[in-house]
Amino acid sequence: LKCNKLIPLAYKTCPAGKNLCYKMFMVAAPKVPVKRGCIDACPKNSLLVKYVCCNTDRCN
């Protein structure tokens, strides 16, 4: 699986066991991602932070 990184057009290949891509952003600024990468399980959203996870190449 390949996931986008925060830098535009950059991506990385996920290590074994991390089979989800995620995008994290602040609830107050939903159009501006704060963090992107590979993850093993989708974290829960909170009042301040929202996570979007997916499982296809570079879907984040």
Swiss-Prot record:
Disulfide bonds join 3-21, 14-38, 42-53, 54-59. Expressed by the venom gland. One of its GO terms (cellular component) is membrane. Coiled coil: none annotated. InterPro entries: Cytotoxin_Cobra (IPR003572), Snake_3FTx (IPR003571), Snake_toxin-like_sf (IPR045860), Snake_toxin_con_site (IPR018354), Toxin_cobra-type (IPR054131). Monomer in solution; Homodimer and oligomer in the presence of negatively charged lipids forming a pore with a size ranging between 20 and 30 Angstroms. Belongs to the three-finger toxin family. Short-chain subfamily. Type IA cytotoxin sub-subfamily. This is Cytotoxin 5.
